[in-house]
Amino acid sequence: MLTVLLAMAGPLPPILPDIGAERPPWVFEADDEALLESAQFGAFRALTSVTAYGGMVRDATNSPVISMAGVGFQLAALALAPEHGWLTEAEAETQALNILQEILNTPNIAKHGLYYHWIDAITGAPRPDWDGVSTVDSALFYAGAIVAGSRFGGLVDDAVVDLLLAADWSKFVLTDEVSGFPSGYLSLAWEPDNEAQPIGAGTLMPFAWVDAMDEERLTVFLAQTQPDTAKSTDPNLWWSLRRPMGNTPAGERVVYSPYSGAYFRTFYAQLFMDTPRMGPDNPSERGFPARTTTDFWENSRRHAQMHRDRAINNPNGLPTLGETGWPLTASLSPSGYAVPGVFPITQPIPGAQRPEDEPNPGGTSPDDGDGTVAVYGAAGALMFDQRAMEVLRYARNLNAPLVWNEPSVGGFGYRDAWNEGDGGWSASQHLSIDDGALLVAIENARTGRVWSLFHDHPFVQLAMDHIGLTRSSCAWGGCPEDVDRNCVIEFSDLLAVLSDWGFNPGSPADVNQDNAVEFSDLLAVLSAIGPCQAGELPE
C-alpha cells in the first residue's frame, strides 16, 4: 500500500493536502450557524416560490424559461427541507414527485434521455432558440434528482431511476476529431437542425468537455451512472480529461481551466461529489502520465486562496474586492451578465502534447471585471476555506436591502451579487443555479448531508466503481497516523512505518513531517490505534 501511495506522485508533482488538514463539515459559531440557516432558508424560498410550469423553478425571478440545472437544485433543496423544518416530509416528497413526474410526462424536452437547457416557463415546451440539449445542465439536473431519490426513496426514486436509465450518453460522444482533440469526448450540447422539430434530426456541437474542471468532471461522472454500457461512455474518459498545470502567486500548484478563471469552475461538481472523503486520484496508473495526481478538494482550496489573495491585493483598485469581497465568479453585474476570474501562472507539463495534454499558451490574463462579487461564490468557497464566512457576514450586514432581504418576513436572503461602486448596486433578479449552489454548498460546509445523500444512491456507487474511484468514511489525510489511508489505524500502519524507516522526505509514514521516519512516528501510530474519525459525516 505504501508503495502505491508513493507512486501516486508519478512524474509530475501531485496536488495533495497537508497531512492532518481539516476538512468539512466545519464547526461554526452559534451566530454564524444562525446566519447560514437563514441564508439557506432564503435560498430555499427562492427555489420553491418562483415557480412556473409543473411547479419547476424559473431560471431567474422574472425569466420566461426554466433551467433544467436549476430544477436539479430545486430537487436537492426539497430533499433537505424536512430536516430544516421548511416543509413536512409529506410536503417535500410530494413536491419532488410532482416535478419528476411532470418532467417524465412532458414531450419533446429530451433527446436520447438528456434535456434541453431551457424549457418554456408557461408551456413546458423546449426552447431551442435559447440553447440545445445540454450535457452539463442535464448532469446538474440528474445530480439533484439523485439526491432527492436517495432522500425520499419510493416513488421519487423510481422516477429518478427511470430518468437515469433513459439517458443515452453514448449519443453525445463526438466521433470525429475536434480542434486537435481525438474522438471520444462528450460534446457540450446537441442542437436540432430545425427548431420546429426539437427532437428531430440534429447535430452535436463541435465543442467538447476536455479539461478536468468541475463542469466536465460532473458531466463525465454522471454518464457513468448509466448501467447499460452501450448507453454510457468509456470510463477512461474521466482519466483522459487534461489537467493544465499552473502555480498560484503563493507558489501552490493547481489544475486550472484555460478558458475561464471564474471560481464556479472549481466547485460545482463538489456540490455533489464528496471530494473531502474521495482523496486523490491517479491518472498515471490508468495510462495518462501527463495528468497529475490530484486531490480536487485541495485543488479548489488553493483556487480559493488565489481568489482571496487577488481580491486583497486588488491591483486595479476596484470597489467591493478585499477580505470581505471574493471570489470572482460568473454573476449578474451592473453591466449585465459577467464572468470575471483569476488564473494561475501557467506551468509546462513535461512530455505533454498540445492540445491533447495541455492548452496552447496565452489567453489566461486575470479579469477582475468591475469588482462585482456574487454571494454564491463565497458560499461555494466555504466548502474549502472557512474565511469565506467573512464575506457572508459582511454581505449580510450591508445596508439592507442592498444585499439582504430577511427570509423570516418573506425575503429570499442574499441577492445574487453586489457592487459598492457608484453608490452601490445589487442584482434585482435571483438565479436558480446560484441560489441552489449557495444552499447546497452551505449544507455541505455545515453537515455534508448532500454529499452523503448523493453517494448513498446505488447508481452513484455504480459510477464510482466504473471509473475506479473510492470514497472513505473519514476525510482523506485527516489522521496522519493512518499511513495507508483506510480510516483505521492498525498493525498495517506500524508495518508501513518500519518499512520506510530512516531519512525519507515525503513519506506518508513520516507522521510528524520532519523528513525522517523514526521512533517518534512509530510511537504516534501506536498511541492512535483505532478508527480514524476525522471528518466523518453524520448519519
Spell out what each predicted region is:
Residues 9, 474-539:
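Cellulosome-associated attachment modules in secreted, modular CAZymes
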Residues 1-7:
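Bacterial N-terminal signal peptides
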Residues 10-476:
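Ser/Thr/Asn(+Pro)-rich, low-complexity disordered segments
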